[in-house]
Amino acid sequence: MRGEADGVLGEWMAAVCGVGEVLDREKTESHLRAVHRHNLKKDLTAHANPQRPTFAYGAEGGLLLCTWPRGGALALPFVYSNEVWTGIEYQVASHLMLLGMVEEGLEIVRTCRDRYDGRTRNPFDEYECGHWYARAMSSYGLIQGLTGVRYDAVDRILHVEPRLPGDFRSFLSTATGYGTV
């Protein structure tokens, strides 16, 4: 068994685009819970990453792209499998939030953001495959994950389904304008 962090990426894309659930919800939730449990590491000191270890290393934490919780890891790992990518961390975190697992999602975000504290890494440049690489823009899904704010331009409907209790204010951006909700 392999725990791939992006195993239900298409389901996340369908959710943030308003398509709705495509896969069985229980299986999606089970997958994301397993990824949170097995792939999120608070300390990578004992983790060997022979590829590009500067994304996360030493006592830093991160969400590993792939794990083998029941054994069976390849002797020669496939490319990138041992890495931490902010774009995948944000994707998994926002998907967890969209499914009501807000604390688990926030735990991933905090672990990720702790690496970009301005001492070792630029907090405004979550580099993965070059500076200002676009995958980290999946962080935009965190707004929807927490606030449930999504605008459907086809039907001209603003959806607001907050996952946090109490009043809040959120950023909103559409093709024709932006503001706060």
What would you call each of these model-derived segments?
Residues 56-59, 78, 89-181:
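Non-catalytic C-terminal accessory modules of carbohydrate-active enzymes
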